[in-house]
């Protein structure tokens, strides 16, 4: 491997991605998304009209100059694998660029599935060592954000850290959902608590706690030693947040990296955008954020594009029905292949190939690919899963009791509709 000795920060920031491999943890069940992940891994869930959730981590890697990527898969991986093969096969292996799929294999040495995030990396150490990288970036494949990893790499190297953890302030009321850290003035991590019942606040900011974003940078050789130690530790859950990071605080080798130092935004006045879309309510909100007049996440930034598999689809079409009613949309995202006929779509996201027939009102809803809505339907605060056919005249989102009896209704009042739910309803 070519080694660069330049001490210039700008030059170093450009060189570091070439010495780096990114590992995206994409095997999670995403059980809090309920039936939305019954047939697909959470990173493969559709998002933002035309994307999959994993496209954000993959695009961040490419835009940051990290073009050697391993995607670690396990649960319901077919859809995810298919998406990566179709949409991310353009990298040039001759230039040492790749997206490598690393499925759980139940190797002879373990004969077990991945037991935790650290074990998922550990079981692939033989492959990862062959990448011959100096730095390993470990990413969650199920978050929505834009980040320049080269800036975090530079911070990691300049501080002389063995490990660096990206962090972001979160409301103290939500702190128990994250790994929470305590840091010194220069962001050395002195304590780390995985999903604590009583998260410690940020000093001087009692309303917020400092949360891990699930983004780690390790010196490669140090990571390999840590994983081997953890693999031989009785009682370990083999998880980065629960086991690896907490023990590093005592060794004083781990630093935090504030997200606002590497967040990519086209509007400096907006706060750094990072969303964990782990619940139906959070997933619904994050999608509809993009349909607002001035969304916090700029998907139109040509300097930091989010790439995905591009299907050969015709443009969206809005037509009038035979009675002369026009198809109309307001504050919505409408993807290729959609047809809206004589209906009104308000503050919603229509994914590819959605068909909305006449006399319908679609309000604050997500219609995933290939959804067909019959005539005279009213849908409000809904997530309609892929390929659902909503019968003519159906009303969803206006009666909480009816919605709960027929479909799944979240704590925030968002109604999830799947093909299985519709089939059971039809069979009654």
Curated annotation (Swiss-Prot):
EC number(s) given by UniProt: 2.7.7.27
Biological pathway: Glycan biosynthesis; glycogen biosynthesis
HAMAP family according to UniProt: GlgC (MF_00624)
Residue ranges crossing the lipid bilayer per the database entry: none
Protein name as annotated: Glucose-1-phosphate adenylyltransferase
Transferase in keyword set: yes
Source taxonomy: Bacteria, Pseudomonadati, Pseudomonadota, Gammaproteobacteria, Enterobacterales
Pfam families the record matches: Hexapep_GlmU, NTP_transferase
Organism: Yersinia pseudotuberculosis serotype IB (strain PB1/+)
Protein keywords: ATP-binding, Carbohydrate metabolism, Glycogen biosynthesis, Glycogen metabolism, Nucleotide-binding, Nucleotidyltransferase, Transferase
Task of the protein: Involved in the biosynthesis of ADP-glucose, a building block required for the elongation reactions to produce glycogen. Catalyzes the reaction between ATP and alpha-D-glucose 1-phosphate (G1P) to produce pyrophosphate and ADP-Glc.
Catalytic activity line of the entry: alpha-D-glucose 1-phosphate + ATP + H(+) = ADP-alpha-D-glucose + diphosphate
Domain of life of the native organism: Bacteria
InterPro entries: ADP-Glc_PPase, ADP_Glu_pyroP_CS, GlgC_bac, GlmU/GlgC-like_hexapep, NTP_transferase_dom, Nucleotide-diphossugar_trans, Trimer_LpxA-like_sf
Subunit-level organization: Homotetramer.
GO BP terms: glycogen biosynthetic process
Keyword hit for Chloroplast: no
Binding-site list for alpha-D-glucose 1-phosphate: 114, 179, 194-195, 212
